[in-house]
C-alpha cells in the first residue's frame, strides 16, 4: 500500500507532525501547520465577530434612544470569511459612530436645554408632569410608549431620551406643549 500521501507522511518535513488515520484503503495526512492555520483563522473570525456584535449593540442602543423603541435583530455572522468579517466590522463601527452622533445631537438641542432650564429637573417626579420637559402621562404614552412601558415615567429616562420624545412630539404637534417657554427659548 504505497500511496503518495503515505510516502509524504513517512518523509515528515521539518517542523511537521503527521497523524494518519486509515479507513479501508484511504489514507488521510494532517500536518500541524494546517491545524495551526485553521486555529489562527478561527481566532481571527471570533475576534472580528465579537467586535461586530459590540458595534451592532452600540448602534441598536443609540437607535433606541432616537426612536424610543428597539430596532430589529441582525443576521448571522457564520457565513463570512475573516476578510469579510473585517470589512463588516468596519461598516458597523461607522454605523455605530453615525448613530451615536445623530443621537447625541438632536434637532434644536440648545433650545430643548433652555426649555428644561425653565420647566424642571430631568428627574422631576412630581404631580401630573414628569421629567425635565414636564411631560404628562398621555404625552409620554403617545410619544414615548415603549420607554414608558419599559422604564417607567419620564423622570427615569435619560435627558437624551426625553429630548427625542419631545422631538417626535414637536414633529407632529409643534411646540404647543411648551407655548410660553418654547417662544422665549427661540423655537417659534
Go through each PLM region and give its residues.
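Peptidoglycan cell-wall recognition and remodeling modules
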Residues: 100-188
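Intrinsically disordered, low-complexity
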Residues: 2-117, 183-188
